[in-house]
A protein has these predicted regions:
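An alpha-helical repeat/solenoid feature that recognizes helix-turn-helix modules
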Residues: 1-27, 35-125, 139-169
Length: 170
């Protein structure tokens, strides 16, 4: 699902830049994301998979919202699930989630496009989580001790309110 969602993101950017983008390609990508969705707001990595990861919720929202489908029926459950988790879980619980920084990045995009009622409480908790995850040298690491990708994702989340990146747009 992450590959499909990111391809949809690139196709949207290409279309906005004036490139010709096949409506069929977008439709097939959206259909795949829809197949990965579960009724409770979670998304599976593959539509035939059993396990749904919390980190994929934001990605599912962005995949649908990037196609101008902010009113898509799958978005409210996914958005509420992310908001609920960030309200309910402690900072330590959030840090222990599988793919915590990755999930935080995609959740940040989803919460940002959802408006301040979702964005502000999410961002406050995300900043606390990321502050505790940051190493003394400034890096962020994932479960496999990779640092480049998680550091880049964490920094994008932290700078979001500054409005420098077009990926954070409403």
């Amino acid at each position: 699902m992450s590959v499909t969602a990111n391809v949809l993101w690139v196709l949207r950017a290409a279309k906005k830049s004036g490139f010709t983008v096949s409506a069929d390609s977008i439709s097939k990508g959206v259909q795949y994301v829809e197949k990965c969705a579960m009724p409770d707001g979670r998304f599976r990595y593959r539509y035939w998979g059993l396990q749904a990861e919390p980190s994929l919720g934001g990605l599912g929202i962005i995949a649908l919202a990037n196609q101008g489908k902010l009113d898509h029926p799958l978005i409210p459950a996914a958005r509420e699930r992310i908001a609920y988790q960030y309200r309910r879980l402690t900072i330590d619980d959030l840090k222990k989630q599988r793919y915590a920084v990755y999930g935080c990045f995609y959740a940040s995009l989803a919460m940002y496009v959802s408006g301040d009622d979702y964005w502000v409480p999410f961002y406050k908790k995300a900043v606390q989580m990321l502050a505790e995850m940051q190493r003394k040298d400034g890096e962020f690491a994932d479960e496999a001790d990779n640092t480049i990708y998680p550091t880049a994702m964490a920094l994008m989340v932290l700078q979001a309110p500054l409005g420098y990146l077009p990926i954070y747009e409403r």
